[in-house]
Amino acid sequence: MAHYFVGDIQGCFAELQKLLAKVDFNPSRDELWAVGDLVARGPDSLATLRFFRSLGDSAKTVLGNHDLHLMALHGKLKRTKPSDNLTEILESPDISASIDWLRQQPLMRELPEHQLIMSHAGVPPLWSLEVLREEAALVSCALKQDDYLEALISQMYSDSAEQWDPSAIGIERLRYCINALTRMRYLYVDGRLDFDCKQPPENCTNPQLKPWFEFASPLRQSHTLVFGHWAALMGNVGDSKLKALDTGCCWGEHLTLWHLEKDQKITQKKLKKS
């Protein structure tokens, strides 16, 4: 059995299929883990989502910011933009089933036998494994409720929840977890989340900002952390226990697959339009 981890697919279904063919992926024996953002921007979000649903227990994904955004669009809480490239999936006959499937997906996953954690954007440096589990579970619970659109999705868009406050309750607590696990790149030196800078560290001009993974963290010492979201890194983080897998396929770069057991990365360049 092999565990394959793939970066942000964002509708780049043809590239995903070529990657899986390169490693002879077989869902009857292997598992495909995705760092989230299965949809948006790329040409085949519908095919990507249907493929993951078809894999059953052989597919493990976490929610990314674009996956949550799809829920908001389906619930008529946001207006779709041409850059989302989500009209096909929103008009598909199985959109409700797709949304229900996404609602069952967590914000973090673990592979305990390999001391590995996967989330879309990373893990807040102050969080222990216990806190990470608890906070992610609160969001998952809210997503599974009948009133998830009104109680969570309609209120999740906020930059106000930028600082971890263990005494926070209700939507503010859920907002911070969503912001941290699906949107985080840089933190201020006081630990606040920054939502503006998307540049790689060498191009960041604000001396008050540091990448989240450069802060001291108990989980950074004990676990391999697999994440996506930050395409500008292009996988370059300088630490073998950090696996940054978003390599900008939807922006014209490439899609990256990491074979855990071999500690090997396989890439597929963005295909040219025919």
UniProtKB/Swiss-Prot annotation:
SUPFAM superfamilies: Metallo-dependent phosphatases. It is an enzyme of class 3 (hydrolase). It comes from the Bacteria. One of its GO terms (molecular function) is bis(5'-nucleosyl)-tetraphosphatase (symmetrical) activity. Its EC number is 3.6.1.41. GO terms for cellular component: cytoplasm. GO terms for biological process: RNA decapping. It catalyses: P(1),P(4)-bis(5'-adenosyl) tetraphosphate + H2O = 2 ADP + 2 H(+). Pfam families: Metallophos. Belongs to the Ap4A hydrolase family. This is Bis(5'-nucleosyl)-tetraphosphatase, symmetrical.
